Amino acid sequence: MLKIKNIRSVCKRFKKTASCNKFKYKKSNLRHILTKKSTKRKRKLRIKSFATKGDKKLILRCLPYK
């Protein structure tokens, strides 16, 4: 029987919380071209976010062994 593999890109982007109920991820748009973005916008982008219920199902399908 073949082993089901984790999708590596999903492993790198999402981290499971300690309670195993949520997946944490970093918001995009904070790598380059930061001069035109306001300080408030950059500060809000630094905060980690949690995946929605719909995304959680997709993430769990991509991570069978997590």
From Swiss-Prot:
Q: Where exactly are the transmembrane stretches of this chain?
A: none
> Is Plastid a UniProt keyword of this protein?
no
Q: Which domain of life is it from?
A: Bacteria
Q: Which terms are listed as keywords in the entry?
A: Ribonucleoprotein, Ribosomal protein
Classification via InterPro entries:
Ribosomal_bL35, Ribosomal_bL35-like, Ribosomal_bL35_CS, Ribosomal_bL35_sf
Q: Which GO terms describe its molecular function?
A: structural constituent of ribosome
Name one process (GO BP) from the record: translation
Q: Name one GO cellular component term.
A: ribonucleoprotein complex
Ribonucleoprotein in keyword set: yes
PROSITE patterns given in the database record: RIBOSOMAL_L35
- Which Gene3D superfamilies does this one have? 4.10.410.60
What is the similarity comment for this entry? Answer: Belongs to the bacterial ribosomal protein bL35 family.
Q: Known NCBIfam families for this protein?
A: rpmI_bact (TIGR00001)
The name this protein carries in UniProt is Large ribosomal subunit protein bL35
* Gene source species: Wigglesworthia glossinidia brevipalpis
